[in-house]
């Protein structure tokens, strides 16, 4: 499974990248707002830090303007991935951009039907929103499972990018079901390493080691 970090915070991205935990980055208009930076400037900096795909989202909702904004975003770096909403105009733009060799991340996916259309349009990634579905009382993981089955049935190459991930359990369940990628906030990715028994065991080992009076280096 690949891990993408869902943030536009360059400091956080650099830290996780140095740990070897980042395969890519996803951003959206809300994260750009939170960063307080210019979208082109911050996205270019992120692309220089991370070797994998960096998703940057268009703000337009109509095809013609989507294509204009996509052209600007595509020039930022070779590892850029153009993010589009799963709408009719978005699917049309996806088909045009993917046919031209661009990576495309179709976002705001809440149904298996939307994921099927995105795959047919040539999307590189489909981003089903787990947490937001959970908020409505629907199990977001069921959507991941449905998409996995459909893509396997027809050998679609579009990768399932589990998004709106809020907990370490979301990450585990997405991995068990077979999502290709999980994108999560920095805090969630860091929390994956934590377990109380690990902390307790380390505390015991360190206390016992101190009693030996030895040094390794």
Curated annotation (Swiss-Prot):
Keywords: Cytoplasm, Pentose shunt, Schiff base, Transferase. The active site is at 83 (schiff-base intermediate with substrate). Its main location: cytoplasm. Pathway: Carbohydrate degradation; pentose phosphate pathway; D-glyceraldehyde 3-phosphate and beta-D-fructose 6-phosphate from D-ribose 5-phosphate and D-xylulose 5-phosphate (non-oxidative stage): step 2/3. Its EC number is 2.2.1.2. InterPro entries: Aldolase_TIM (IPR013785), TAL/FSA (IPR001585), Transaldolase_3B (IPR022999), Transaldolase_3B/F6P_aldolase (IPR004731), Transaldolase_AS (IPR018225), TSA/FSA_arc/bac (IPR033919). GO terms for biological process: carbohydrate metabolic process; pentose-phosphate shunt. Transaldolase is important for the balance of metabolites in the pentose-phosphate pathway. This is Probable transaldolase. The gene is tal.
